[in-house]
Design a protein with these regions (language model features):
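Glycine-rich, anion-gripping cofactor-binding loops and their flanking helix/strand elements
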Residues: 1-76, 176-207, 222-223, 255, ...
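Short, well-ordered beta-to-alpha junction loops that form the rim of enzyme active sites
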Residues: 18, 162-166, 309-312
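Thiamine diphosphate
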Residues: 46, 86-88, 94-96, 100-104, ...
Length: 335
C-alpha cells in the first residue's frame, strides 16, 4: 500500500510507521516521522493533531509504551480483521477493507479538498528531529558505526536485524529505509533468526546488498547457518555486536532487581576462527575511527563477511536498554 500512502502524504497527511511498516514511505520524505512513535516529542506533536488514521497496524505494546502512548483523537482504523475492536486501542470508526483500496479511495475523495495547516509539516519535522537527537545521544559511542552503515549502504541495501540490544537501541529506527521490504526483523522477540532471514533476503534479491545485524548470543543460536550461506552462494555482510554477555538481561537486572546478576554471562567462541572454518572473511573492530572506509570496502567486494565489533573495547551505550520502553505510573506525593 506504499503508493496509496505516498498519495496521502503528498496531499497533506503526516505518516508514522511501526517498525515492521518501515519503508512504506521513504524515510527521507518530508512528511514522515519514521518509526519514532514512542518518543516524547512525537507524543507532544500528536496532541496538536486533529485525528489519526491507523492502517493495518496492531499498535503493539512494544511500540506504544505498553498501550499508554496517547494517540490523536478521533481514531479511525482500516483493517481486514474485525477483531481489531477487541484490542487495547479501540477505534472510533473501523473500515473493514484492503489497505491499498481504502487509502486510494480516501485520496480520491480528499485530493484538492484537504486544507492542512501550513505549520503542520514544520511541527512534524521538528518532532522527528528532536526524537532523532534523543535516540542518537543514547547510542554513543556507536554513532560512527551507524553513520557508516547509512552512508555506504545508501538506499540500495536490505537491512536484516536480529533481536539484540543494538537493534533495539538504534537498528530499528536510525538506518533509513526507502522501500517496504528493505527491512527484515523478527517481530516476535526471539533471538537467533537473523542469519537465516538474511540468506532468504539474499536469495530473493541477489542484486542487492544484504546487511545483517546480530549480537553474540543470537549468532550462537544460529551459527550453523553460516555454513548454509556458503552452500547457497549468497552475498551477506553480518555485523556482530559482541558484548560477551546477555546485555539486555543485565540491564533488566540493574533496573528491576537491584543490580544482582544471574545467568547473564555468556561464553563466546572465537568467531574469527569459526568464520575462517566455514569460508567467511572476517574483520575485527575494536575502535570505530576508520569504520566508514572499511565498511565501504567490505560492501563493495561482495561475498560473505563477518564484521565483529568488540563492545567491551569500545564501551557501553550511553543509555542502557532494559527491555521495551513503558510509561511508569506517576507516584503520588505524600501529604
Amino acid at each position: 500500500a506504499s503508493d496509496a500512502a505516498k498519495r496521502l502524504a503528498d496531499i497533506g497527511f503526516g505518516v508514522v510507521t511501526s517498525v515492521q511498516g518501515r519503508g512504506t514511505l521513504p524515510e527521507d520524505h518530508k512528511a514522515t516521522l519514521g518509526a519514532y512513535n514512542i518518543y516524547q516529542p512525537v507524543e507532544d506533536f500528536y496532541k496538536t493533531c486533529d485525528a489519526i488514521l491507523v492502517v493495518g497496524s496492531r499498535l503493539r505494546s512494544n511500540e506504544t509504551l505498553n498501550y499508554k502512548l496517547k494517540l490523536p483523537s478521533p481514531h479511525y482504523q482500516v483493517d481486514v480483521d474485525l477483531d481489531v475492536l477487541n484490542r487495547p486501542y479501540k477505534p472510533d470508526m473501523l473500515v473493514l477493507g484492503d489497505s491499498q483500496l481504502v487509502m486510494e479511495a480516501l485520496a480520491d475523495k480528499l485530493d484538492g479538498r484537504l486544507n492542512t495547516d501550513k505549520e503542520f509539516i514544520v511541527d512534524l519535522q521538528s518532532a522527528r528531529k528532536k526524537a532523532i537527537e534523543y535516540l542518537r545521544d543514547g547510542f554513543k559511542p556507536y554513532k560512527p558505526l551507524v553513520d557508516a552503515i547509512q552512508a555506504t549502504g545508501g538506499a540500495d541495501f536490505i537491512w536484516v536485524r536480529d533481536v539484540t540490544v543494538s537493534n533495539s537501541t538504534w537498528g530499528n529506527r536510525s538506518v533509513l529505509l526507502n522501500r517496504p521490504y528493505d527491512g527484515v526483523h523478527a517481530m516476535g522477540g526471539g533471538i537467533g533468526q537473523s542469519v537465516q532471514m538474511a540468506i532468504g533476503a539474499a536469495i530473493a534479491a541477489p542484486d542487492r546488498k544484504v546487511v545483517c545485524l546480530v549480537g553474540d548470543g543470537g549468532l550462537q543460536v544460529n551459527i550453523g547457518e553460516m555454513a548454509t550461506a556458503i552452500q547457497e552462494g549468497v552475498n551477506i555482510c553480518v555485523i556482530l555486536m559482541n558484548s560477551k554477555d546477555y546485555e539486555v538481561i543485565k540491564n533488566i537486572q540493574d533496573n528491576s532487581f537491584g543490580g544482582r546478576k544471574y545467568f547473564a554471562d555468556l561464553y563466546t567462541p572465537d568467531f574469527e576462527a569459526h568464520a575462517e572454518s566455514v569460508g567467511w572473511s572476517y574483520q575485527m573492530f575494536n575502535n570505530l575511527s576508520c569504520v566508514k572506509s572499511k565498511f565501504s570496502s567490505v560492501l563493495k567486494s561482495g561475498g560473505l563477511k563477518l564484521l565483529e565489533v568488540d563492545m567491551k573495547a569500545i564501551g557501553p551505550y550511553a543509555r542502557a536498554f532494559g527491555g521495551p520502553p513503558v510509561r511508569q505510573p506517576k507516584t503520588r506525593k505524600k501529604g
